C-alpha cells in the first residue's frame, strides 16, 4: 500500500491510500464540527444536520442521492456525529468511486435542507432519542461524561421538544451552522482504493473545487479533567466495569501508544491479561474507546464486561490491569515490535471502509513502535481516573444528565486486598518449544482457488447444522488460547459467526513450521465436550436480539453437528499438513446436503425492550443459481424503496431495512422494522403492502435499470476473502445455490416477476419473529 497526504490551495487536507489488490474503494470526509459546537438554543443541531445531508443536494435528488444510489451499487454508507467532529463515509465498487465522491461533495457543499426533510428527520431523531434512553452503551457513556461537568452535561442527541415546530427558524439555524463550519480548512478527506495516487488526487481536487475557503468558527468549550468519581448505575445489559483515563499529550502520540497497548490487552494467549481475567472468571471481554480527543489531551475508556461483575471483582480487575501494565513496560523491544506487527496485521485484515474509519477516527496502528512507549506507560498511572460499574440489580436514585435518566448509586466501600504477582508472558518467548514433527500426508481436502495471498483452512458445521449458543461459546473458550498461540507463531485464526453459521477460519503461512505445529491442537478443540456457559444478557436494542435469534429460530440447533472443511491456497504441502489434523474431526467427503427443515410461522420472543420490533425472513422459493440471482436483484430494488417509504415518508420508526440475507445457509429476503409506537400486526401489514405494491413497480422496470442491477451483481460474484471462496466451493460441491456470472447475465424481468410472485404466494414458508413488549 502507498500513501500520500497533501493540503490543497483552499486548505482541504487530503489523505490518499493506493491499495492495488482492492476491488472496492472507500471515501470519508471529516468535518471539525460536532455536538459541542452547537448553541445552547439548539441541542442536537449537528446530529440533525448529519441526517439532512443525505436528504438531497443541489446536484443530486431522489434516487440519485448518495444513499439510495449507493444501495443500488451494492455499497455501504453511514455517518457519525461526535463531540467535536462529524464524519460521512462510504464503500462501493472501485469503478464507481468518482460518481460517489461527486455525490459526497455536493451534499456537503449544497444540501437542500428543505422544510419537509427537516420535519421528517426531526421525527426520526425523536424516535432515535427514545431508543437511546434505554441503550446501555449510551447511558454508560453519559455517566462517564458527566464526571467532567460543564458542556459535557448538556443534551446533545436532539428531540422533537428541542427542535420545536418552527421549521423556518430551525432551517435558519441549520444553514448558519453549515455556513460556519463546513469550509475546506475545517475538513479532511480520506480516499482509498485500487486507483493510483495520482488518480485519487484528481478525485480529491475535484471534491475540493466547490468547497468554500475561509476559517471555520470552531471554538470549543474548555474540557477539563473529570473528577475522580466512582459510581454505580443500573442497566439491564451485561454488567461492566469502566475505567476511564484522562491523559495529557499530543493526540497522535497518545493514539499510537494506546493502539499498541491494546494489542497487549487483547492478547488471549496463556499468560496474557485476558487469559488471567478469564481464568479468575472476572471478565469476558475488554473494549477500548476514546470518549474525547483533542490536540493536547484525550479521554480513554476501558470497558471490562462479564455476565456478572461485583464491586470487589472490579477492584481485582483494576489491580491486575496495573500489574500487567508494569510487566508490559518491562517487555523487550523485540516483544514491543512483535505486538505492533500483530496490530498491523489485524488492521490490514479489516475492510477498506473500516480501515479508512480507523485512520480518520483514531484506531490505526503506527508504522513503528512509538518513540517513548515505555515513558508513556510509566506516566499512565498518574492520569486522572474515573470508575463506573453497571449492575442489573441496584438500590439507586434517579439522576438526569445529558437528557438521560440514570439510576445511580455510590460505590460500596470495598477494600482492595493484596495481590500476588502474576507470571505474565509475552511473545516471542525465550523458551524453546519442542513440538512433534509434522506428518507428511493427510486425507484429501476440497480445494478452492485463492483470492488472497495466503493459505486458508475453513472448518464449519455441515450445511443446515446450526450450533446452540452454549456449544458455540464453549468451543470459543477452548479455542481462544490455542488461536492466540497460533497467531504468535505466524498464523492467525478466528472462531466467528458468519451469516448465522459458526465457523473456524485459519490462515497459515507457507514457510512457518511453528504455525503448522500449532494446528493439531487448534483443531482438537472442536472435539472437546460442551461445557455449561453462564447466561448472557440480551442486547439492549430489540431488533438486534431478534437478529441474533433468527438462525436458531429458522433451523433448530443440531444435537451432534457434523463438520466439513475446505482449503483455499496454492501450497500442497501446507494443505496436506492441515488435512492430517482434520482426520479426527471432519468428514473429508461429506454427503450432499439434505433439504433444510425450516421452521416457519410467528414466534414471540421475550426481549427487554419497550419498542416493538418485527423481523420477517422469506426463504428463497427455489434453491438454484438462477432464482438466487433473481432474489439478489429484487433486493437491490427493494432496499432503497422500503427505506424511503417506511423510514422517510411514513416514519414508522428508527430501524427500517429490506435486504437479501443468507441465514444459516438459507438464502432469503429479510425485512426488519422497529417502532416505539406501532404494534407488530400493523408493521406486518406495512411489509405485506410494500411487497404487493412492488408488483406494479417491478412491471415498470426498464432494460437500463435491470442492466444496472446486473452490473452490480456481477461485481459481487467473485469472493473477496479466501474463507468465502472455500465456503462457495463447499456449496457448489453439495449442490447449493451460489451467485454466478452466468445466472446474473441471464436475468430477465419475467424471471424476477416469477420469483417475486412466489415470495408473495408462499406465505406458509415465511418466518416471523416479534418481541413480547414489556
Model features per residue range: what roles?
Residues 2-4, 146-188, 222, 252, ...:
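Histidine-acidic residue clusters that define the catalytic metal-binding segment
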Residues 18-69, 128, 253-265, 451-493, ...:
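Active/ligand-binding-proximal structured segments within catalytic/core domains
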Residues 31, 58, 63-177, 273-275, ...:
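Acidic/histidine-enriched segments that form metal/cofactor-coordinating
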Residues 33-35, 92-94, 188, 193-195, ...:
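A generic structural motif
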Residues 116, 168, 188-191, 195-203, ...:
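Non-catalytic accessory/assembly modules
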Residues 183-184, 188-242, 249, 565-622, ...:
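An aromatic/glycine/proline-enriched structural segment found at the starts
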Residues 242, 266-308, 481-496, 615, ...:
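A structural supersecondary motif
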Residues 339-450, 552-581, 712-774:
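C-terminal regions of mature proteins
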Amino acid at each position: 500500500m502507498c500513501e500520500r497526504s497533501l493540503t490543497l490551495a483552499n486548505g482541504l487536507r487530503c489523505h490518499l491510500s493506493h491499495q492495488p489488490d482492492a476491488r472496492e474503494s472507500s471515501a470519508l470526509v471529516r468535518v471539525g464540527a460536532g455536538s459541542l459546537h452547537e448553541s445552547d438554543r439548539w441541542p442536537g443541531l449537528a446530529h440533525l444536520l448529519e441526517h439532512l445531508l443525505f436528504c438531497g443536494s443541489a446536484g443530486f435528488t431522489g434516487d440519485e442521492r448518495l444513499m439510495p444510489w449507493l444501495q443500488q451499487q451494492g455499497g455501504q454508507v453511514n455517518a457519525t456525529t461526535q463531540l467535536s467532529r462529524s464524519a460521512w463515509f462510504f464503500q462501493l465498487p472501485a469503478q464507481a468511486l468518482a460518481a460517489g465522491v461527486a455525490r459526497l461533495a455536493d451534499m456537503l457543499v449544497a444540501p437542500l435542507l428543505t422544510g419537509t426533510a427537516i420535519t421528517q428527520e426531526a421525527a426520526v431523531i425523536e424516535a432515535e432519542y427514545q431508543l437511546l434512553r434505554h441503550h446501555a452503551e449510551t447511558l454508560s457513556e453519559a455517566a462517564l461524561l458527566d464526571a467532567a461537568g460543564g458542556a459535557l452535561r448538556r443534551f446533545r442527541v436532539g428531540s422533537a421538544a428541542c427542535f420545536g415546530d418552527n421549521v423556518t427558524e430551525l432551517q435558519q439555524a441549520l444553514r448558519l451552522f453549515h455556513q460556519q463550519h463546513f469550509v475546506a480548512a475545517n475538513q479532511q478527506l480520506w480516499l482509498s482504493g485500487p486507483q493510483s495516487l495520482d488518480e485519487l488526487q484528481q478525485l480529491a481536487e475535484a471534491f475540493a473545487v466547490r468547497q468554500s475557503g475561509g476559517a471555520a468558527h470552531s471554538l470549543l468549550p474548555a474540557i477539563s479533567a473529570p473528577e475522580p468519581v466512582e459510581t454505580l448505575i443500573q442497566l439491564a445489559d451485561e454488567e461492566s466495569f469502566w475505567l476511564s483515563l484522562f491523559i495529557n499529550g499530543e493526540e497522535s502520540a497518545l493514539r499510537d501508544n494506546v493502539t499498541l497497548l491494546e494489542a497487549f490487552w487483547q492478547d488471549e494467549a496463556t499468560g496474557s491479561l485476558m487469559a488471567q481475567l478469564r481464568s479468575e472468571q472476572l471478565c469476558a471481554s475488554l473494549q477500548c474507546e476514546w470518549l474525547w480527543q483533542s490536540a493536547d489531551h484525550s479521554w480513554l475508556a476501558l470497558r471490562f464486561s462479564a455476565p456478572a461483575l461485583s464491586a470487589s471483582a472490579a477492584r481485582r480487575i483494576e489491580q491486575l490491569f496495573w500489574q500487567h501494565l508494569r510487566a508490559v513496560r518491562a517487555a523487550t523491544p523485540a516483544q514491543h515490535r512483535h505486538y505492533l506487527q500483530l496490530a498491523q496485521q489485524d488492521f490490514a485484515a479489516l475492510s477498506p471502509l473500516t480501515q479508512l474509519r480507523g485512520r480518520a477516527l483514531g484506531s490505526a496502528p503506527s508504522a513503528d513502535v512509538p518513540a517513548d512507549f515505555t515513558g508513556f506507560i510509566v506516566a499512565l498511572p498518574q492520569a486522572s481516573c474515573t470508575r463506573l460499574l453497571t449492575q442489573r440489580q441496584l438500590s439507586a436514585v434517579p439522576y438526569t444528565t445529558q437528557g438521560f435518566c440514570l439510576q445511580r448509586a455510590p460505590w460500596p466501600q470495598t477494600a482492595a486486598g493484596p495481590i500476588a504477582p502474576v507470571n505474565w508472558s509475552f511473545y516471542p518467548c525465550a523458551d524453546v518449544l519442542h513440538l512433534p514433527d509434522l506428518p507428511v500426508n493427510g486425507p484429501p481436502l476440497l480445494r478452492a482457488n485463492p483470492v488472497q495471498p495466503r493459505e486458508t483452512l475453513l472448518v464449519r458445521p455441515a450445511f443446515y447444522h446450526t450450533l446452540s449458543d452454549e456449544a458455540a461459546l464453549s468451543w470459543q473458550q477452548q479455542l481462544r488460547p490455542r488461536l492466540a498461540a497460533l497467531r504468535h507463531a505466524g498464523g492467525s485464526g478466528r472462531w466467528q459467526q458468519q451469516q448465522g453459521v459458526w465457523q473456524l477460519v485459519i490462515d497459515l503461512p507457507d514457510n512457518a513450521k511453528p504455525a503448522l505445529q500449532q494446528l493439531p491442537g487448534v483443531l482438537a478443540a472442536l472435539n472437546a465436550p460442551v461445557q455449561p456457559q453462564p447466561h448472557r444478557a440480551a442486547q439492549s436494542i430489540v431488533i438486534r436480539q431478534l437478529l441474533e435469534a433468527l438462525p436458531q429460530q429458522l433451523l433448530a440447533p443440531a444435537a451432534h453437528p457434523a463438520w466439513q472443511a475446505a482449503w483455499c491456497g496454492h501450497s500442497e504441502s501446507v494443505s496436506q499438513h492441515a488435512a492430517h489434523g482434520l482426520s479426527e474431526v471432519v468428514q473429508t467427503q461429506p454427503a450432499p446436503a439434505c433439504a433444510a427443515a425450516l421452521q416457519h410461522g410467528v414466534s414471540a420472543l421475550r426481549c427487554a425492550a419497550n419498542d416493538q420490533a418485527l423481523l420477517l425472513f422469506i426463504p428463497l422459493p427455489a434453491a438454484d443459481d438462477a432464482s438466487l440471482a433473481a432474489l439478489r436483484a429484487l433486493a437491490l430494488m427493494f432496499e432503497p424503496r422500503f427505506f424511503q417509504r417506511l423510514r422517510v415518508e411514513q416514519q414508522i420508526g428508527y430501524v427500517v431495512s429490506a435486504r437479501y440475507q443468507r441465514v444459516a445457509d438459507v438464502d432469503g429476503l429479510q425485512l426488519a422494522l422497529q417502532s416505539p409506537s406501532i404494534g407488530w400486526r400493523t408493521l406486518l401489514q406495512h411489509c405485506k403492502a410494500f411487497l404487493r405494491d412492488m408488483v406494479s413497480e417491478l412491471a415498470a422496470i426498464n432494460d437500463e435499470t435491470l442492466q444496472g442491477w446486473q452490473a452490480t451483481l456481477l461485481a459481487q460474484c467473485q469472493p473477496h476473502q479466501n474463507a468465502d471462496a472455500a465456503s462457495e466451493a463447499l456449496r457448489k460441491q453439495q449442490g447449493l445455490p451460489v451467485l454466478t456470472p452466468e445466472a446474473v447475465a441471464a436475468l430477465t424481468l419475467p424471471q424476477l416477476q416469477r420469483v417475486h410472485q412466489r415470495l408473495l404466494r408462499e406465505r406458509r414458508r415465511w418466518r416471523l419473529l416479534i418481541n413480547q413488549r414489556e
